[in-house]
């Protein structure tokens, strides 16, 4: 169903609300128009390790709203990813004993699963952090915990090089594919390492990620964070 270029997305929603009073199929119309507005009609690539999942603007789950997720593992049995733009109020000092500057190293919330586990995403590679797994060009996940502690305790730079993440996002077999088919996520095969490792606020990183997806998605950044407030 086409959208007239002369209408803004807000004009369109107003028109749809008007129609809802007289059209019993409003739910189906809303779904179709929503998909069209958000440029999701193109077939998404199959997810793979190192891909980025970007939540569409209308996802309102408290955990995943405007989330940017790096897939760190994916196979036929399921998927694992970490949200990279969900800063918490906690620091590394809350989970590891160390020098006072540990209080300046933030913790991120990677998802609702395994909140008693801490993970680390970094750019350091196996020469510095043995046994880490490369998940994308220039990005590594996990590795030798003692090596990580030594690196940080020695005062080596962390900003832009390491993110400490509590919890993760997990999908069982077929679950992520189902969510993608519902257009909850769009997939980016390659994304800037500096963006993933940046310390922007959640909404700012999401908007920057939208920009990296190209021109056709830029209308997403005009969508209010809380549409009900408008």
Residue ranges of model-derived segments:
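N-terminal amphipathic/basic-hydrophobic helices that include classical n-h-c signal peptides
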Residues: 1-29
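A short aromatic-anchored loop/beta-hairpin motif
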Residues: 13-16, 31-165, 169-230
């Amino acid at each position: 169903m086409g959208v007239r270029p002369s209408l803004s997305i807000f004009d369109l929603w107003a028109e749809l609300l008007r129609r809802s009073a007289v059209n019993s199929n409003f739910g189906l119309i809303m779904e179709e128009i929503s998909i069209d507005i958000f440029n999701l009609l193109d077939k998404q690539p199959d997810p793979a390790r190192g891909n980025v999942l970007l939540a569409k603007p209308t996802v309102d789950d408290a955990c995943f709203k405007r989330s940017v997720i790096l897939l760190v593992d994916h196979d036929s049995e399921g998927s694992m990813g970490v949200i990279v733009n969900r800063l918490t109020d906690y620091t590394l000092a809350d989970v590891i004993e160390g020098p006072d500057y540990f209080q300046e190293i933030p913790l991120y919330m990677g998802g609702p699963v395994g909140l008693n586990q801490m993970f680390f995403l970094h750019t350091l590679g196996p020469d510095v952090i043995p046994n880490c797994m490369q998940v994308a060009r220039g990005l590594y996940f996990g590795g030798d915990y003692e090596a990580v502690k030594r690196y940080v305790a020695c005062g080596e730079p962390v900003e832009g090089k390491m993110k400490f993440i509590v919890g993760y996002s997990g999908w069982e077999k077929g679950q992520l594919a189902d969510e993608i088919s519902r257009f909850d996520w769009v997939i980016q095969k390659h994304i800037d390492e500096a963006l993933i490792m940046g310390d922007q606020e959640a909404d700012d990183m999401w908007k920057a990620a939208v920009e990296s997806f190209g021109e056709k998605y830029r209308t997403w950044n005009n969508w209010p964070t809380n549409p009900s407030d408008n």
